Design a protein with these regions (language model features):
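Thiol-/selenol-based redox modules, centered on thioredoxin-like
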Residues: 145-183
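Active-site-proximal beta-strand/loop segments in catalytic clefts of secreted hydrolases
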Residues: 66-70, 95-99, 132-136, 153-154, ...
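Short active-site neighborhood of thiol/selenol oxidoreductases, capturing the structured segment around
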Residues: 52-77, 93
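Loop/turn elements at helix/coil->beta-strand transitions in domains of secreted/extracellular proteins
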Residues: 59-64, 88-93, 126-128, 145-147, ...
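Short, internal strand/loop/helix patches
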Residues: 110-154
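Structural microenvironment flanking redox-active thiols in thiol-disulfide oxidoreductases
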Residues: 74-120, 136-140
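Secretory targeting signatures
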Residues: 1-32
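N-terminal "domain-start" segment that seeds a small globular fold
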Residues: 22-55
Length: 183
C-alpha cells in the first residue's frame, strides 16, 4: 500500500512540474512545437467577466494569447505580470487548456491580480486581460505546456510563439508586440 501511495504522489508531482516551482529556464525555451499554423484559429468564448470575446471582436487589433491552466501559478502568473509591466492595457487572452477545472475564470483572474500584491497593498489588476477556456484552440495549435505564449497580429496571423521562460522577458515582449502591430 505504501508503494502505491508513493507512486501516486510521484506521478502527481510530475503532473505539476513547471507550474509550481521556481522560474528555472526550460531546456529549450524557444518553442519546440510540431508545426504551428500561420494563422490563429477562429474562437468565440465567454470570459471571466461574463462577456463574449472572439477573434472577430479583435479583428484589426494585435493581441497576445497565454495558454495556461487555473492551477498554474508561479511561472504563468509571473509571465502575465511581465507582459502587463512591459505593455499595460493591451488585449491579452489567457486561455485555459484545462476544461475540467473546478476553479472559476473569475477566481483565476482574481488570483492572478493578487499574485504581485504586497500584503494588503494591491499592485496591478490586469484589467485588459480576459480569462477564458481555450482547450480546443490549444489542441489545434498543439500546445502542450502551460505558459505557452502566442502573439497574434492585426490580421490574425501568428507572429511569434514560445514557452513562458522565453516570453517572460520584457525586451522580447516589447519587440514582439511591436512586430505584431506592424501594418
Amino acid at each position: 500500500m505504501r508503494c502505491k501511495m508513493f507512486a501516486v504522489l510521484v506521478a502527481s508531482s510530475l503532473f505539476l512540474a513547471g507550474c509550481t516551482g521556481d522560474k528555472e529556464e526550460d531546456e529549450d525555451s524557444s518553442a519546440s512545437y510540431s508545426e504551428m499554423p500561420e494563422t490563429f484559429p477562429q474562437w468565440d468564448e465567454l470570459t471571466d467577466d461574463g462577456t463574449n470575446w472572439s477573434s472577430t471582436r479583435l479583428d484589426g487589433q494585435a493581441y497576445i494569447v497565454i495558454f495556461s491552466a487555473q492551477w498554474c501559478n508561479l511561472p504563468c502568473m509571473d509571465l502575465m505580470h511581465t507582459i502587463w509591466n512591459t505593455v499595460p492595457e493591451i488585449p491579452v487572452m489567457v486561455m485555459s487548456t484545462d476544461n475540467g477545472s473546478e476553479i472559476s475564470f473569475e477566481d483565476w483572474h482574481d488570483s492572478a491580480d493578487a499574485h504581485d500584491d504586497d500584503g494588503d497593498e494591491p499592485n496591478n489588476n490586469l484589467t485588459s486581460f480576459r480569462f477564458l477556456l481555450g482547450d480546443e484552440e490549444g489542441n489545434v495549435l498543439g500546445i502542450e505546456s502551460p505558459g505557452t505564449t502566442v502573439f497574434v497580429n492585426k490580421t490574425g496571423d501568428i507572429t511569434w510563439y514560445g514557452k513562458s521562460s522565453a516570453a517572460n522577458d520584457a525586451d522580447l515582449v516589447m519587440e514582439q508586440w511591436d512586430i505584431a502591430n506592424q501594418d
